[in-house]
């Protein structure tokens, strides 16, 4: 569409059938914004935790549009290198801005709680690992996402609504958590992104559960990746094995499953930053 017969809309073309349809173009914005909500108390966690929220390019310009929610873990590492644990951020906002303005994705809100300094291992793992004597609070953390954080997002931002399913993504233990969430709560999560997931946790328990369990949701989209350098080749043998298990269970590559190998990539933020656009292009197409 054209604005005042002069300015073309950004993003993708709108393909419709004859009839009346609602479309939500935007014309001037070229970048989204990240808002930070710091030192907020969350009763489900009994803790104060910062949350970063990315608002896509069209958010301020088109006030009628509503957006799906993508939960991402380790929010401190996603946007601002100055806040990142190791000084390197994924630049999630830049990746999403580019894809949105090129018309490559459905715009979404990214809601990214910061991880706990001392509780991350417990909150991101579904079972207790006897070797580490830690873990097993993933269900409590997912309850926080779904029953406290999600209602807060719906109340404060324009989303598709409380009843709609959400997406989830993360790296390392956050990738393990994302797979677990989508596999065990298909009514709440419709897709997941697992960057270098820690499939080794608790004797590969989650991967064994996926291999022997029933398919929870045939329309579940899964993005799965790893590098191939560093200790354990960044878990590449296990991620490839999980890819094969999913394909045996009827997932199809480039349909509802995307597998990416980052050649020369190690288990670090810089590598996930290089691959994140591939995940967004697949999950939010």
List each language-model region with its residue ranges.
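Active-site machinery of serine-nucleophile hydrolases
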Residues: 76-147
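C-terminal catalytic histidine-bearing segment of alpha/beta-hydrolase fold enzymes
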Residues: 225, 229-243, 247-285
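Short beta-strand element of the alpha/beta-hydrolase
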Residues: 55, 63-76
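Primarily recognizes the serine-hydrolase "nucleophile elbow" in alpha/beta-hydrolase
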Residues: 162-209, 215-216
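Short, proline-enriched alpha-helix->beta-strand connector loops that line the catalytic pocket
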Residues: 216-222
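A short loop-to-beta-strand scaffold at the N-terminal edge of the catalytic core in hydrolase folds
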Residues: 45-61
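Gly/Ser-rich "nucleophile elbow"/oxyanion-hole loop immediately N-terminal to the catalytic nucleophile
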Residues: 60, 126-171
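The feature marks proteins involved in alpha-glucan
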Residues: 2-43
